[in-house]
Amino acid sequence: PFKDPNQQVKNQQLKESCALTVLLGSHHRVYYYTGIPTETAPPTIKTTYFKPNGGIRDIIIAKMKEVAQRKASGELGAKDNVAVLIKATPNSTYKDMVDMLDEMNINEVPVFAIVDISPVELEFLAVPEADATKP
């Protein structure tokens, strides 16, 4: 039977400490933030790329280590896992999406989903994306 890849994330309530949101932008830029933003606390969006050192892979590895340490300390339960939400902007490329899915596989991310980017997130990216188009 067909299994909705987003269903696993829908069925589990994301814990703020386990959430990593990845926004695929233009010019192979990868924006990301941790946690779950609210109206009163917008996210702090950071920028990286698909590069061997210091890229999105290192961000994912760091998040997985952080969650593992919190599990070991008892702060998180045994079933709590990193959950990566992948969102593509209209200016991102198919290759970037494939590369991001490869990163999920390489890093053995237990829970991830491809979801639509929100209008609010597009607003957050308006300035960094405008800067990306400048030579």
Task: Cite the ranges covered by each PLM segment.
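Periplasmic peptidoglycan-binding/anchoring modules of Gram-negative envelope and division proteins
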Residues: 48-76
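Soluble extracytoplasmic domains of inner/organellar membrane proteins
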Residues: 77-122
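Extracytoplasmic juxtamembrane/flexible linker immediately downstream
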Residues: 1-50, 76-78, 113-135
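Short beta-strands and strand-coil junctions in structured, solvent-facing domains, enriched
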Residues: 5-9, 66, 91-94
